[in-house]
Regions:
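Internal gly/pro-rich beta-alpha loop/helix module
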Residues: 1
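Amphipathic alpha-helical interface segments
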Residues: 5
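Thiamine diphosphate
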Residues: 10-160
Length: 160
Protein backbone atom coordinates (compact mmCIF):
# COMPACT_ATOMS: atom_id res chain seq x y z
CA UNK A 1 0.00 0.00 0.00
CA UNK A 2 1.10 3.53 -0.66
CA UNK A 3 1.99 5.23 2.61
CA UNK A 4 4.95 7.46 3.31
CA UNK A 5 5.59 7.32 7.02
CA UNK A 6 5.69 4.99 9.96
CA UNK A 7 3.02 2.38 10.48
CA UNK A 8 2.29 -0.47 12.86
CA UNK A 9 0.87 -3.75 11.61
CA UNK A 10 -0.71 -6.15 14.07
CA UNK A 11 -1.55 -9.70 13.05
CA UNK A 12 -3.14 -12.62 14.84
CA UNK A 13 -1.35 -15.86 15.58
CA UNK A 14 -3.99 -18.06 14.03
CA UNK A 15 -5.14 -17.94 10.41
CA UNK A 16 -8.54 -16.29 9.97
CA UNK A 17 -11.10 -16.44 7.22
CA UNK A 18 -11.45 -13.59 4.75
CA UNK A 19 -14.65 -11.59 4.77
CA UNK A 20 -13.35 -9.14 2.21
CA UNK A 21 -12.18 -9.79 -1.32
CA UNK A 22 -8.80 -9.09 -2.92
CA UNK A 23 -10.56 -6.44 -5.02
CA UNK A 24 -11.64 -4.43 -1.96
CA UNK A 25 -9.80 -1.12 -1.71
CA UNK A 26 -7.97 -0.55 1.55
CA UNK A 27 -7.34 3.10 2.23
CA UNK A 28 -5.47 4.18 5.34
CA UNK A 29 -7.86 6.03 7.62
CA UNK A 30 -11.00 4.80 5.82
CA UNK A 31 -13.18 2.14 7.46
CA UNK A 32 -14.82 -0.70 5.54
CA UNK A 33 -18.55 -1.23 5.95
CA UNK A 34 -18.89 -5.02 5.72
CA UNK A 35 -22.66 -5.17 6.20
CA UNK A 36 -25.42 -2.61 6.70
CA UNK A 37 -28.21 -2.89 9.23
CA UNK A 38 -30.57 -0.64 11.15
CA UNK A 39 -30.66 -1.77 14.81
CA UNK A 40 -27.07 -1.15 15.94
CA UNK A 41 -23.54 -0.53 14.73
CA UNK A 42 -20.77 -3.00 15.52
CA UNK A 43 -17.29 -1.52 15.17
CA UNK A 44 -14.51 -4.12 15.14
CA UNK A 45 -10.84 -4.46 14.37
CA UNK A 46 -8.58 -7.34 13.38
CA UNK A 47 -9.77 -10.85 14.10
CA UNK A 48 -12.69 -9.38 16.04
CA UNK A 49 -14.21 -8.39 12.72
CA UNK A 50 -14.44 -12.11 11.90
CA UNK A 51 -16.05 -12.94 15.28
CA UNK A 52 -18.46 -10.01 14.92
CA UNK A 53 -19.35 -11.20 11.42
CA UNK A 54 -20.17 -14.64 12.87
CA UNK A 55 -22.25 -12.98 15.60
CA UNK A 56 -24.41 -11.35 12.90
CA UNK A 57 -25.89 -14.78 12.11
CA UNK A 58 -26.97 -15.18 15.75
CA UNK A 59 -28.49 -11.70 15.71
CA UNK A 60 -30.37 -12.37 12.45
CA UNK A 61 -32.07 -15.35 14.13
CA UNK A 62 -33.43 -12.84 16.67
CA UNK A 63 -34.51 -10.40 13.91
CA UNK A 64 -31.73 -7.92 14.72
CA UNK A 65 -29.86 -6.29 11.85
CA UNK A 66 -26.51 -4.66 12.49
CA UNK A 67 -24.06 -2.59 10.53
CA UNK A 68 -20.58 -4.12 10.80
CA UNK A 69 -17.66 -1.76 10.34
CA UNK A 70 -14.12 -3.07 9.95
CA UNK A 71 -11.63 -0.60 11.38
CA UNK A 72 -8.35 -1.66 9.84
CA UNK A 73 -6.77 1.71 10.70
CA UNK A 74 -7.28 2.85 14.30
CA UNK A 75 -5.20 5.99 13.85
CA UNK A 76 -6.38 7.94 12.06
CA UNK A 77 -9.86 6.70 12.96
CA UNK A 78 -12.55 7.14 10.31
CA UNK A 79 -14.80 9.16 12.62
CA UNK A 80 -17.13 10.20 9.83
CA UNK A 81 -18.11 6.62 8.91
CA UNK A 82 -18.51 5.62 12.56
CA UNK A 83 -20.62 8.65 13.52
CA UNK A 84 -22.79 8.41 10.40
CA UNK A 85 -23.46 4.72 11.07
CA UNK A 86 -24.21 5.19 14.77
CA UNK A 87 -26.67 7.98 13.94
CA UNK A 88 -28.42 5.68 11.46
CA UNK A 89 -28.69 2.84 14.02
CA UNK A 90 -30.52 4.71 16.79
CA UNK A 91 -27.32 5.72 18.60
CA UNK A 92 -26.41 2.12 19.46
CA UNK A 93 -22.78 1.06 19.13
CA UNK A 94 -20.86 -2.03 20.20
CA UNK A 95 -17.07 -1.93 19.90
CA UNK A 96 -15.14 -5.21 19.62
CA UNK A 97 -11.40 -5.61 20.08
CA UNK A 98 -9.14 -8.36 21.39
CA UNK A 99 -7.05 -5.92 23.37
CA UNK A 100 -7.29 -3.70 26.43
CA UNK A 101 -10.02 -1.13 25.94
CA UNK A 102 -7.77 1.57 27.45
CA UNK A 103 -5.88 3.26 24.64
CA UNK A 104 -7.45 1.08 21.98
CA UNK A 105 -10.38 1.09 19.60
CA UNK A 106 -12.99 1.29 22.38
CA UNK A 107 -11.48 4.48 23.71
CA UNK A 108 -11.02 5.94 20.21
CA UNK A 109 -14.68 5.33 19.27
CA UNK A 110 -15.91 6.68 22.63
CA UNK A 111 -13.85 9.81 22.05
CA UNK A 112 -15.25 10.22 18.52
CA UNK A 113 -18.82 9.96 19.86
CA UNK A 114 -18.42 12.13 22.96
CA UNK A 115 -20.33 15.07 21.46
CA UNK A 116 -23.16 12.96 20.04
CA UNK A 117 -26.50 12.79 21.87
CA UNK A 118 -28.34 9.70 23.12
CA UNK A 119 -25.53 7.20 22.55
CA UNK A 120 -25.91 3.67 23.87
CA UNK A 121 -22.37 2.32 24.07
CA UNK A 122 -20.99 -1.10 24.94
CA UNK A 123 -17.71 -2.93 24.41
CA UNK A 124 -16.36 -6.46 24.11
CA UNK A 125 -12.70 -6.08 25.04
CA UNK A 126 -10.19 -6.91 27.73
CA UNK A 127 -10.96 -4.79 30.76
CA UNK A 128 -7.70 -3.66 32.34
CA UNK A 129 -6.43 -7.05 33.51
CA UNK A 130 -3.00 -8.60 33.53
CA UNK A 131 -2.46 -10.67 30.41
CA UNK A 132 -2.09 -14.42 30.32
CA UNK A 133 -0.28 -16.82 28.04
CA UNK A 134 -2.00 -19.63 26.20
CA UNK A 135 -3.61 -20.79 23.02
CA UNK A 136 -5.56 -18.15 21.13
CA UNK A 137 -8.93 -19.89 21.46
CA UNK A 138 -8.48 -20.47 25.18
CA UNK A 139 -7.48 -16.86 25.79
CA UNK A 140 -10.40 -15.46 23.81
CA UNK A 141 -12.79 -17.69 25.78
CA UNK A 142 -11.18 -16.69 29.11
CA UNK A 143 -11.69 -13.01 28.33
CA UNK A 144 -15.24 -13.45 26.99
CA UNK A 145 -14.21 -12.57 23.47
CA UNK A 146 -16.57 -14.87 21.58
CA UNK A 147 -19.25 -14.54 18.91
CA UNK A 148 -21.82 -15.55 21.55
CA UNK A 149 -20.75 -12.75 23.89
CA UNK A 150 -20.75 -10.25 21.03
CA UNK A 151 -24.31 -11.29 20.13
CA UNK A 152 -25.37 -11.17 23.80
CA UNK A 153 -23.98 -7.65 24.30
CA UNK A 154 -25.62 -6.53 21.05
CA UNK A 155 -29.00 -7.86 22.22
CA UNK A 156 -28.62 -6.07 25.57
CA UNK A 157 -27.82 -2.87 23.72
CA UNK A 158 -30.88 -3.14 21.48
CA UNK A 159 -33.12 -3.73 24.53
CA UNK A 160 -31.90 -0.57 26.34
Amino acid sequence: YKHNGPCYLRTSREPVENITTPDDEIEIGKAQVIEKGCDLTIVATGMMTILAHRALAILREKSISATLINIHTIKPLDKETVIESVRSTKGRVLVCEEANYVGGLTEAVASALVEENNIKFCSVAIFDKFGQSGLTGELLEAYGITKENIASKALELVKR
